[in-house]
Amino acid sequence: MTSLSIKQKAQQYVLLTGMALFIGLLVGAIDMIFGQGLLLIGDFRSQHWPLTLFLAIAGLVIVYLYKRFGGKASKGMGLVFDVGHVREEKIPLVLVPLIMLTTWISHLFGGSVGREGVAVQIGATLSHRFARHVKIPDASRIFLMTGMAAGFAGLFQTPLAATFFALEVLTVGELQLMALYPALIASIVASFTSHALGLEKVAVPLKETLSWTPENLIKVALLGLAFGLAGKLFAVSLSWLKKTVAKVLPNPYIRIALIGAGLSLVLLTLQLTKVGTYSGLGTNLIDVAFHQGSAQSYDWILKLLFTVVTISAGYQGGEVTPLFAIGATLGVFLAPMLGLPVLVVAAIGYASVFGSATTTLLAPILIGGEVFGYANLPFFVIACAIAYCLPKEWSIYSGQKVAKK
């Protein structure tokens, strides 16, 4: 290698470092605005439950906004995957305000949706615009993944999980290491920025640890299978229902109005009869699971059902926080059957249902460590690995590719 090539390489790293720092600051700040907005909206909705009656009308507004302003941005996360696989060249900047506004609307009126997919889209959209100004190999994909990582990290403040999520999610079985350096820097900076600006991190340090015995290893493997099946059930149900409702109700206005009206009635009935509250992110279910060690036996399946129906209707938001809630509540239900500590099993479910539904491995393992501490890391590895072994084509991301063997 010549001194000139070494100098050029050094210049590239200096440039990547500076841009990753800026991307982390920018995306972290926007994630804070988005995340705090969701928290305020969630609190407001819980104090004004009749808002859920207007879920159908809110849906009509969402469809109108996307019809009027969306264009290619209407593809959402699918567009991010298309750019990552070079099927599309760019992501319209309008995606950022549009996805933030429509997700806030979905939450305000009681939709059962998440936030992670939105944050990833925000980060990817903003970061990818820098690629055209940098002359390095694979700049488009590198900056796309850098933004995806920053978006995830700014919202959840789990920079390691965010980094590896971005590197492994585009193509199952391949780790895009060329983006590791800028993605890690942007993730750390985005996480620090959103936290410094007031967005709190979800952290539940576990006091209990599982002992390393053959019996516990078998039990955790069985849990990995159960949680893996739950994640795949979510993914397959979402894919099937999206296609079915689009075929049965091809008009998006009629589709979201009819399904939204039905959802509002059922969600309100369940809430008012004290069966459970399934609107919003599902953080209420997560809080009860980890702070009280309790959940209803049906919480996980109802949260799964309402999230799948809400997203299939056309409401905006992510899937990951509902997946966390599904995993945690299913874990609370399964733990007594296996004689294992409730909070540990809930934590394993939190991580591995997410991993199964997204067909990722390293990200859910690291989520377990960053949210719950690393004392139980070997058991996160076992459960997430078992869940990852299930059919990889069953994913919430239709644009995801599976690497050829």
Place the predicted regions along the sequence by residue:
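Alpha-helical transmembrane segments and immediately membrane-proximal extracytoplasmic
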Residues: 1-405
